[in-house]
């Protein structure tokens, strides 16, 4: 990282101020920073030169007894970086508090890209070979005098800010140097909390229903129009949606009821006319008309290209949203999950019609508890009511989905990812299964598209292909699509991840029944009403997991194949989900820390599995995104929390530093990038992932405005384990090896390095 930054408090001295300086915080959100109050073109002086008003330098503090600060609100202290100085030798330049006057945004943007974006991808990164310097005007001189902005980080931030200014239709802007050389830890945290979550938030309302309902994944004639399906007994929601469709017929929005009984056959019948599934809505009074109207609760989506509510992504995003005080969005997602279970029978993979048979890893009990606590817990009747409804729904899903056929294996008493479904998953990209279908097409002497139609219409029967797609749907339900761990076997595996989550459900339900509902949850079947009932279920599950999944010698929980009745040997990071659930004994936790953790810890954090388990790669056996060498935010978050639960916060601190370094380094070197997953074995370009589906969050022009949902959360949550010393190190991109190596002996212990 290079450039120049203020790393010292300003000296006391007299200064002039301006109305702009007093109003606009250098770290405010783009809608404020590039709003009308800061537009130079609207603040022209009436002097004889008709020149833009001259503003004084904005300093974070000045004068004896004067207190003023633009410190980011997300940190109690600001720890800026030291960077190389430029030619400007003024006092303000030496303090890193210059302000730049960009007289022509479009012209400057073009010049910047022409000079610095040498690979033409509309980003400025360490891979570009430009001069890494640009001249810009100063505010004090109305742009007459120029200074230099240097280095990849500041230039990429300049590109981001100019791109945002253009989005707000700004022709001229005044930019604070503090915004361009902001400590990257502060900047990323600020963007996640103040901008990314906003960009990822959706809700079903009259303004965007057609956009959200439109499906980009399905390319059939009947999929051209936006469509939404509504549960048969949701008349208010149905009428509201019909009203919106009639308000603007040009949208061609179709609103249809679903039947009471939803079968796999019915779900398949919707594949050529897919639609969005209605979510929870609440009644509001229209302030203009005074009439009652229904509006959807807000929810967050994983990435910018998504409009659906996703299953387990939502839990991890909720953790970050709560950390950012976005309680309304986190609560909205709990409301949606309650609605989905009540009306669709389960928390869905996502709220599209072709996901009606498929769930995802269950996290509702912990999610509801986190939201309830943020709402005030038992001191808030609204929070307790939400908790009651959420746990009632979670228990329903537990009994009818996760511990029922076909997901429950009766012999072991453990559960598998075994969803219903018929035919080929329609949401996959064209050609995704061609290598599998080719031999069947040749068998029937037809083309692959023709065979696909024959198979989906059940005019031909291929039992082996049925089993293949059963496992494929299971992989998608597991959330780990795809991995060699699950290939051609997923539906037959009692996995440590799913059964850890169900154990967590059991202990959470026991806790809530006892604490909030007088140890008697009315309306439940016999054997499931009291805390003692659920504690017994948890004890039995732990015994079965220890019997079938735990391996004392290696210190791993492995998956168990219920068909072959054999334990697998695939070393997955999900072994640590048992710690997150609180299911392991202290002795088991120690074995995992001593034996499993060293195998899964890499340069940038925890890897999804070991290289040995993944096996050799080839043209016929390509990389899978949920395997080595990739690391994922949900794994980091659960393992951090699980280790802390068992007294290993030192290891959590070390692992979190590794992951946060990787994220920060990519953010600094690659134009503010925040992506879905990282290669945790690479220190230079960890965002570059060569696997199926690419890497969500990497494809942007000029500025990243969303990041990726659960990765955003991981940064906020990981920072909670960092002290000021670690934050400073991350802000200057000190590698884990150097950082750990320079720690004093007492500090090394805090990172599990003694």
From Swiss-Prot:
User: Active-site positions, per UniProt?
Assistant: 481 (proton donor/acceptor), 676 (proton donor/acceptor)
Q: What class of enzyme is it?
A: hydrolase
Q: Which InterPro entries match?
A: 6-hairpin_glycosidase_sf, 6hp_glycosidase-like_sf, Glyco_hydro_37, Glyco_hydro_37_CS, Trehalase_Ca-bd
Compartments (UniProt record): Cytoplasm
Q: What does this protein do?
A: Hydrolyzes intracellular trehalose to glucose. The disaccharide trehalose serves as a storage molecule for energy and carbohydrates that is mobilized during nutrient stress.
What family classification does the UniProt entry report for this protein?
Belongs to the glycosyl hydrolase 37 family.
The protein's name is Cytosolic neutral trehalase
In the UniProt record, what gene is named as encoding this protein?
A: NTH1
């Amino acid at each position: 990282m290079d450039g120049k930054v203020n790393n010292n408090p300003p000296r006391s001295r007299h200064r002039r101020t301006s109305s702009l300086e007093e109003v606009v915080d250098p770290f405010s959100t783009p809608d404020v920073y590039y709003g009308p109050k800061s537009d130079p073109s609207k603040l022209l002086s009436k002097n004889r030169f008709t020149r833009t008003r001259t503003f004084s330098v904005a300093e974070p503090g000045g004068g004896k007894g004067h207190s003023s600060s633009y410190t980011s609100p997300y940190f109690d202290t600001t720890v800026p970086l030291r960077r190389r100085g430029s030619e400007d030798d003024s006092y303000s330049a030496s303090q890193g508090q210059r302000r730049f006057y960009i007289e022509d945004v479009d012209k400057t943007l073009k010049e910047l890209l022409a000079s610095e974006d040498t690979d033409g991808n509309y980003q400025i990164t360490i891979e570009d070979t430009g001069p890494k310097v640009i001249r810009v005007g100063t505010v004090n001189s109305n742009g007459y005098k120029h200074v230099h902005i240097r280095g990849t980080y500041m230039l990429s931030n300049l590109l981001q800010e100019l791109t945002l200014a253009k989005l707000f239709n700004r022709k001229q802007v005044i930019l604070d140097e503090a915004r361009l050389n902001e400590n990257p830890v502060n900047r990323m945290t600020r963007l996640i909390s103040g901008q990314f979550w906003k960009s990822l938030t959706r809700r079903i309302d009259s303004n965007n229903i057609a956009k959200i309902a439109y499906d980009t994944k399905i390319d059939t004639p009947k999929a051209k129009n936006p469509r939404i399906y509504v549960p048969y007994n949701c008349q208010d929601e149905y009428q509201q949606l019909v009203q919106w469709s009639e308000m603007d017929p040009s949208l061609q929005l179709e609103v249809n009821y679903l039947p009471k009984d939803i079968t796999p056959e019915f779900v398949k019948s919707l594949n050529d006319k897919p639609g969005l599934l209605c979510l929870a809505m609440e009644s509001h009074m229209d302030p203009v008309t005074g009439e009652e109207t229904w509006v959807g609760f807000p929810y967050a989506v994983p990435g910018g290209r998504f409009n659906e509510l996703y299953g387990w992504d939502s839990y991890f995003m909720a953790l970050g949203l709560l950390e950012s005080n976005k309680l309304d969005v986190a609560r909205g997602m709990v409301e949606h999950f309650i609605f989905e279970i009540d009306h669709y029978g389960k928390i869905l993979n996502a709220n599209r019609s072709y996901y009606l048979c498929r769930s995802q890893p269950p996290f509702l009990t912990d999610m509801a508890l986190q939201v309830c606590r943020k709402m005030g817990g038992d001191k808030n009747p609204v929070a307790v009511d939400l908790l009651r409804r959420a746990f009632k729904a979670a228990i329903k899903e537990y009994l009818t989905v996760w511990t029922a056929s076909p997901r429950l294996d009766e012999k072991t008493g453990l559960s598998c990812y075994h969803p219903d479904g018929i035919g080929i998953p329609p949401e996959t990209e064209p050609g995704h299964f061609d290598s599998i279908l080719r031999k069947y097409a040749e068998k029937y002497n037809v083309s692959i598209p023709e065979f696909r139609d024959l198979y989906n219409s059940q005019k031909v029967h291929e039992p082996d292909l049925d089993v293949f797609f059963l496992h494929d749907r299971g992989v998608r339900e597991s959330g780990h699509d795809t991995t060699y761990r699950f290939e051609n076997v997923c539906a037959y595996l009692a996995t440590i991840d799913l059964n850890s989550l169900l154990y967590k459900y059991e202990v959470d339900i026991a806790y809530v029944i006892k604490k909030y509902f007088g140890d008697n949850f009315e309306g439940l079947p016999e054997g499931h009403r009291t805390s003692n009932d659920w504690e017994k279920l948890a004890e039995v599950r732990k015994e079965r997991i220890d019997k079938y999944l735990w391996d004392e010698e290696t210190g791993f929980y492995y998956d168990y194949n219920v068909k072959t009745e054999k334990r697998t040997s695939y070393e997955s990071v999900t072994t640590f989900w048992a710690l997150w659930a609180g299911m392991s004994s202290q002795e088991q936790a120690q074995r995992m820390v001593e034996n499993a953790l060293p195998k899964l810890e890499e340069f940038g954090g925890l890897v999804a599995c070991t290289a040995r388990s993944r096996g050799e790669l080839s043209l016929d056996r390509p990389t899978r995104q949920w395997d080595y060498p990739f690391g994922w935010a949900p794994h980091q978050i659960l393992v951090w929390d699980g280790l802390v639960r068992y007294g290993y916060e030192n290891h959590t601190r070390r692992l979190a530093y590794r992951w946060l370094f990787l994220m920060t380094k990519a953010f600094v070197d690659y134009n503010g990038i925040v992506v879905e997953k990282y290669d945790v074995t690479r220190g230079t370009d960890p965002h570059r992932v060569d696997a199926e589906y690419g890497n969500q969050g990497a494809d942007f022009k000029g500025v990243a405005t969303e990041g990726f949902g659960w990765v955003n959360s991981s940064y906020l949550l990981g920072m909670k384990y960092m002290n000021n010393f670690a934050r400073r190190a991350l802000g200057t991109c000190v590698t884990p090896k150097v950082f750990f190596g320079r720690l004093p002996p007492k500090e090394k212990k805090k990172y599990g390095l003694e």
